[in-house]
């Protein structure tokens, strides 16, 4: 316990001294050191799945009908481009109709010890073979077949270029139920929350996935063969959604990616909202 306290004190001193970017990196590295003991890299036998009938999942804690307009438009875009699939938009009250989660997770999020975003991270790991799309994702085309055909696919980051500690984001996930990476992440999260009732870092999922990605030949092989989804391009629209709308810039981004990560923390321009439904 004294060793942990000393480590925390050292981190607090470093956080006070360094700028915002360095503070973010320090927090991420300390979180990874703490999470390391929970990593679980067991690999299960691979089973075949029917990619043509993959369900699509999303989540809004208070229910789809209570989501803000931006989120409603995002859901509409998913229906427009992936309406041939079974689309399930869950809420806290409907989860039990679709999947069985350990009661501990419900208790943690209800008590406020687990943020809703991290509860959502847990949920997506229990949905077996699926495509997960965060509620803040807008589609402007169908999901490419090469992604549907993959056993595991997430949005990628360039840690050096993006000045970040992780090489993935979890707002879009394509995963088979027996994906080595999916199961390793799931078991690691289970190991962590079985012993802890606090959030070590908001980006726990990304930290864990990055740490696991090359831990075994099986994990690395699956990671290396996944289609490349460029996080910088997928997130570009978020940076301009509240500015003067440019149809030319919007069309250019749509030509580069089928999905766009937005945020409900910004007020989108009226022109932007109008074009979301086009």
Features from the language model and the residues they span:
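Glycosyltransferase-associated regions of secretory-pathway enzymes
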Residues: 1-120, 137-278
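Solvent-exposed aromatic/hydrophobic patches embedded in short alpha-helical segments
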Residues: 119-130
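Short beta-strand-to-loop acidic/aromatic patch adjacent to the donor-nucleotide binding site
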Residues: 128-138
